């Protein structure tokens, strides 16, 4: 029994994170030098994301009996994303107004170092609905795969899947080749995931070594407020949605515990995207639903990022004594409903969207970003974890609503009684 525990990815990643924290705290300079380990692991994952999405979406769509179901799945997913992310934005807004973590700080924006956030404000200037939509269309298919742009690859994969489906029997050879290639790709993923503990160790050692635990204490009220809000959102909002759909949020979290630990170590929900595609299909969701919902959710269903954006914006207003009446806050909410859709599931994207939002709202000092620059990295974990759980729940909800969910398989997997699949899960172990 002990041997199996030590061999599990869950234990290995947890141990790696703990060792990384200790190294970063007691030997900060050495901890900072571990950064390449975390970066290298994330780059390996990003290397494989584009082909995984392409294969999953193409085989999922091409293998469907009716094309109408694809359009229905997409429409249901987008509607769900909009409703739940709006709830997340409102919850963040309500909590930050009640707790007021920035009240009493009385900071003069002119004394803040705006140069520290210049790189984010520059990137934020490129944010906007039209540029975002235009960016979804790749200049070339090769460019989409080379850059690893999730939405560009998704767009091409959907079009390719539709075209392959229309070929019917003539396209069977191509379908079989892509399906076989998909199995090879997931074999590569299993190899990469063996390095997950090393990546989590390096990323955590760097974070603690560079920013220090002291940074957490300085603005601890905002961090604590944000983490508690994320927990409440997961168990109250997502938990209620899960219960209404027919499964337990607690069992689902246990089911993806290894992925959650990897995200905790790397601060990027994108680092487990390939594994989530595999696990959501294993839990009973049709491949076509998984292939559409998960990749799209990485831009349109970022619940943790939505909570962070409203809380951070109002915190800056409170700390700098920038008055925000109810109309200002409604304006902020409307702007975030659009700008939050441009955030990807990668570290730092939420900060860029926040910079864009402050610029768009106008009366909030963009220089106020310097206040949370030091602690943004520590809030990134909660954002990524909430985003991951949110996308997983969304996939099951959409699959059930579209009648593309095997509920018996869902119950068996979440209860741990599906022996055949559990036996196959050593891909995530040893």
Curated annotation (Swiss-Prot):
Q: What is this protein called?
A: C4-dicarboxylate transport protein
A molecular function GO annotation: fumarate transmembrane transporter activity
- SUPFAM superfamilies linked: Proton glutamate symport protein (SSF118215)
One Gene Ontology term, aspect cellular component: plasma membrane
Q: What is the lineage of its organism?
A: Bacteria, Pseudomonadati, Pseudomonadota, Gammaproteobacteria, Enterobacterales
Q: Which GO terms describe its biological process?
A: L-aspartate transmembrane transport
**Function summary:** Responsible for the transport of dicarboxylates such as succinate, fumarate, and malate from the periplasm across the membrane.
Q: Which family does the UniProt entry place this protein in? A: Belongs to the dicarboxylate/amino acid:cation symporter (DAACS) (TC 2.A.23) family.
